[in-house]
Amino acid sequence: MKTTILITYVIATISLPISPLRASELSDAIEADYGRLDALFRHFHANPELSLQEFETSERLATELEALGFEVRRNINETGLVGTLRNGDGPSLVIRADMDGLPVREDSGLEYASTVMQVNKEGIEMPVMHACGHDMHVTTLIGVAKQLANNKDKWQGTVHLVGQPAEEELGGAKGMVADGLYEKIGRPDFALALHVIAKYPAGKIIISDGLVYSSADTVRITVRGVATHGAAPHRGKDPVVIGAQIVLALQSIVTREVSPMEPALITVGAFRGGTAPNVIADHAQLDITVRANTERTRHYLLEAIERVAVQTARAAGVSEDRLPIVDISPNGSPTTTNDAGLARRVSSAVSAGMGEDALLEWYQSDMGAEDFPDLVNIDPPIPSVYFEVGGTPPELIESGTWGPHHSPLFKIDSETSIKAGVEAMTLATMELLGRS
């Protein structure tokens, strides 16, 4: 009789559904944890680190995850890490946060503003700032980790929390995959990531069911001329003049070769050439960023840039052995595009948990890019959702006085955006790993 009762109890227990985490419970738990998260955010903001130099950030993240019961693997692509929490059978999920700062001198006015100086990979000492919100991303990841660790009766499966280096250089995700990330943790069933966005009101959640960000490629053109005296230009080939002609000709690719209905961008961000006013140098360099919303346009732009550079030099009489050298960085990244079905599931979960008014419609106002696709575009691709969290008080948006990303003036409403980010990401995780 006792055996029968025990078996019946076990069967009944196994068949009971996992009770969902009520919205009020989650928001109250995040509120109770915010003092800790605020201290972490201030620490990360005041101590930014350049790409692939995120040693202290990575170690602090690892320590926080280990304290919550996560198994942490360090040193994936130098400073990358992954913290794993297993909770029975079920799907596996990657949640990624990027960690690096930018070579920007902070002028935000925050009492915990960065005064950090770091030597970059060229050996130059630079000011460093979290001018894109990656401090918020790491803090949010830690907040999500606590909610998952404290509510293991509400989900099942495996969660891998990834601290990724070098997003700003568009090589960190690719480097982690190349360094064996998925050999270490296995191929996940889903992947999620978020980004705080200054153009949206703080606390709002924005989820696209398709395109999120453009592709990005970096191109360097080395224009080679023939050096001569500045008073005798006819005896040489002036790479500065040829470079200037190339700069202008590149703009015609976008305006005259690509459909006006297709977004495309070629920006020459740097032009270096010459050493003195009376010297015509033997070379000049152009550094270019290239953006597109489709792979077809992306490849067309890259091919067209090389064609324009070479043919412009030929038209100037440059010999075949001195034609421009066009280098395309291997750290380019494709478009960030959400899985439509997964995005709808995440949107529904966020709407149900945070209210319909928490969601805003996605729109594209610029051609920003991300390297998250390099984390998920393996063979076969991992279904993924990348969503945005508003970061600026509405009154600052209305007055136009907010600091844009990568600006010395950049700052967010950290409390509102972190709480919203933790709640939305936890709800998304419960949706993908929960059981009805």
Model-predicted regions and their roles:
Residues 31-35, 48-59, 131, 135, ...:
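Soluble non-cytosolic domains of exported or imported proteins
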Residues 244-436:
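Metal-dependent amide/peptide-bond hydrolase catalytic core
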Residues 24-130, 135-156:
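Acidic/His- and Gly-rich active-site-bordering loop/insert found
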